[in-house]
From Swiss-Prot:
Protein name: Replication protein E1
Gene responsible for this protein: E1
HAMAP family xref list: PPV_E1 (MF_04000)
Oligomer status and interactors: Can form hexamers. Interacts with E2 protein; this interaction increases E1 DNA binding specificity. Interacts with host DNA polymerase subunit POLA2. Interacts with host single stranded DNA-binding protein RPA1. Interacts with host TOP1; this interaction stimulates the enzymatic activity of TOP1.
Modification Phosphoserine occurs at: 81, 89
One Pfam entry name: PPV_E1_N
Biased composition (Polar residues): 587-604
A Gene Ontology cellular-component term: host cell nucleus
UniProt family annotation: Belongs to the papillomaviridae E1 protein family.
InterPro entries, sorted: Helicase_SF3_DNA-vir, P-loop_NTPase, PPV_DNA_helicase_E1_C, PPV_DNA_helicase_E1_N, PPV_E1_DBD, PPV_E1_DBD_sf, Rep_E1_papillomaV, Znf_lg_T-Ag_D1_dom_sf
């Protein structure tokens, strides 16, 4: 018979089990026991402090929550297991509208063989679910905005919103946004014409914008395809990009990121045809007449042939009539005339704009110089004072001369000989201390008669006297000792009123007379013995008193163009200036100077 399993009876192991302990006298010694206890390495083994109950309620609450969570997981596993849904249709796992990623948080805690695994260490078993975007199921009449929400989501998901909008624009209209517009880098640059594309606009706001924008625009072009809306806005006043965006966002209730805005291409025929042909199709709303830049490039008419040819004589005539001789002024102002003048448009389209501007300025100077030489001093003064607008009073000049202790009768006699360029009397000197009004008085006279000012600082150049050949009256302001010495050495004949040889740039020396020359200086040349040969050639008047000013720092005597105009009109006879009616043909008005070819449609 086999041995029974397990241990044997008590008799079997009585040999090795010690039934009684040995007694020792050493352990019975109490003193040694206490000493051994104090030498122990374990301190505070027994806690003798008072006991506290602790937060047992919180522990109980945690245990209850853990138990409830376990019961809830079991209930979900039993009733709502996703594996049961996948078993009904296994092909659902392969259907997905967008790439899916494994969920980082598990909804169901699975158990295997009755042992619950932790959520962090368990391998996930996730089923692929079909995602369908939530669309507002409300009908349109109840304010449903499901389609607009889809457009917003597609825009928000894109990393480059501008590129996304441009791609959608090209897909909708069949043409790139940059093909219709030119780029403005700055948001502060103003322009009257703007191309605006807005994405995902509500239909009601889109329709209302067609009426609201009419009060801001002279021309309006609107079209909407799918989610894209395109506007061509020709505003009544220039606006920058920030102002346009502010207007559109407030009117259409959209964000600024949904807007593309640039000015249109004004000189591109293909772009102009896009807007022109768009008006002929259905679905486009337009308001107002075509802008000029569209009409000129798309509509054929009798003006096209004329606009394509540039007439240089018309440009010269325009500059002559507007008294323009500077190249910069001619170029800028003629370019601004382009919207109104077909010849200016043709000039802008020409490749030789700078060449025409230089030649135009040169021709105007030639005509002005010839016109000046053809006029007498009386006719010149009459012409210039009638170009002055407004009225003044001649007494301001007379009062100022009397304030400076100048005998007005003597000044009037000297001024008469000065204007008529009598020999040895065509040079007047005004001298006195600083701040006495010498330069103000002389400059006001030169300004109204369109004279020239010479500066001795240019005396190192042999052409510094060239302006004397291009004016009727001249001024050298603030003459000092070096200038007096130069005049004493080289300008005696010129001050006498005789012919001199004047060297001009790019020309041979020419024979001419000095015009009436006005001088201002702090030096009384008549008291200087070194310049005794100039005493008989110069008539001097002293201004000893400081120039008077009002309490508001304005001049007490108004030496303006209007004052000189009234002065010449009042003293025309005393200055022995010729009557302009006698110089004309029986008082009849003479025809203005014309340097352009006459037109066939010109009035007789």
């Amino acid at each position: 018979m086999a041995d029974p399993k397990g241990s044997t009876s008590k008799e079997g192991f009585g040999d090795w089990c010690i039934l009684e302990a040995d007694c020792s006298d050493i352990e019975n010694d109490m003193e040694q026991l206490f000493e051994r206890d104090t030498d122990s390495d374990i301190s505070d083994l027994i806690d003798d402090c008072d006991l506290e109950q602790g937060n047992s309620l919180e522990l109980f609450h945690q245990q209850e929550c853990k138990q409830s969570e376990e019961q809830l997981q079991k209930l979900k596993r039993k009733c709502l297991s996703p594996k049961a849904v996948a078993q009904l249709s296994p092909r659902l796992q392969s259907i997905s509208l967008s790439p899916q990623q494994k969920s980082k948080r598990r909804l169901f805690a699975e158990q295997d063989s009755g042992v619950e695994l932790t959520l962090n260490n368990e391998a996930e078993d996730v089923t692929t679910e079909v995602e369908v975007p939530a669309i507002d199921s409300r009908p349109d009449d109840e304010g449903g905005s499901g389609d607009v929400d889809i457009h917003y989501l597609s825009l928000l998901r894109s990393s480059n919103k501008k590129a996304t909008l441009m791609a959608k624009f090209k897909a909708a209209f069949g043409v790139g946004f940059n093909e219709l517009t030119r780029q403005f880098k700055s948001h502060k640059t103003c322009c009257n014409h703007w191309v605006v594309s807005v994405y995902a606009v509500h239909d009601d706001l889109f329709e209302s914008s067609k009426q609201l924008l009419q009060q801001h625009c002279d021309y309006l072009w609107v079209r909407g395809i799918d989610a894209m809306s395109l506007y061509l806005l020709c505003f009544k006043a220039g606006k920058n990009r920030g102002t346009v965006h502010k207007l559109m966002t407030s009117m259409l209730n959209v964000h600024e990121q949904q807007i593309l805005s640039e000015p249109p291409k004004l000189r591109n025929t293909a772009a102009a045809l896009f807007w022109y042909k768009g008006c002929m199709g259905s679905g486009v709303f337009s308001y107002g007449p075509y802008p000029d830049w569209i009409a000129q490039q798309t509509i054929l008419g009798h003006n096209n042939a004329e606009a394509s040819t540039f007439d240089f004589s018309q440009m010269v005539q325009w500059a002559f009539d507007n008294q323009l001789v500077d190249e910069g002024d001619i170029a800028y102002r003629y370019a601004r005339l382009a919207p109104e003048d077909a010849n200016a448009v043709a000039w802008l389209a020409h490749n030789s704009q700078a060449k025409f501007v230089r030649e135009c300025a040169a021709m105007v100077r030639f005509y002005k110089k010839g016109q000046m030489r053809d006029m007498s001093m009386s006719e010149w003064i009459y012409t210039k004072i009638h170009e002055v607008e407004g009225e003044g009073h001649w007494s301001d000049i007379v009062k100022f001369l009397r304030y400076q202790e100048v005998n007005f009768i003597m000044f009037l006699a000297a001024f008469k000989d000065f204007l008529h360029s009598k020999p040895k009397k065509n040079c007047i000197l005004i001298h006195g201390p600083p701040n006495s009004g010498k330069s103000s008085f002389a400059m006001s006279l030169i300004r109204v008669l369109k004279g020239r000012v010479l500066s001795f600082v240019n005396s190192k150049s042999q052409f510094w006297l060239q302006p004397l050949s291009e004016c009727k009256i001249a001024l050298i302001d603030d003459v000092t000792d070096p200038c007096w010495l130069y005049m004493d050495n080289y300008l005696r004949n010129g001050l006498d009123g005789h012919y001199v040889s004047l060297d001009c740039k790019y020309k041979a020396p020419m024979q001419t007379k000095f015009p009436p020359l006005l001088l201002t200086s702090n030096i009384n040349v008549h008291e200087e013995a070194n310049y005794r040969y100039l005493h008989s050639r110069i008539k001097g008047f002293a201004f000893p008193n400081p120039f008077p000013m009002k309490s508001d720092d304005t001049p007490q005597f108004e030496l303006t163009d209007q004052s000189w105009k009234s002065f010449f009109e009042r003293l025309w006879t005393q200055l022995e200036l010729s009557d302009q009616e006698d110089e004309g043909e029986n008082g009849e008005s003479q025809r203005a100077f014309q340097c352009s070819a006459g037109s066939a449609n010109e009035h007789l």
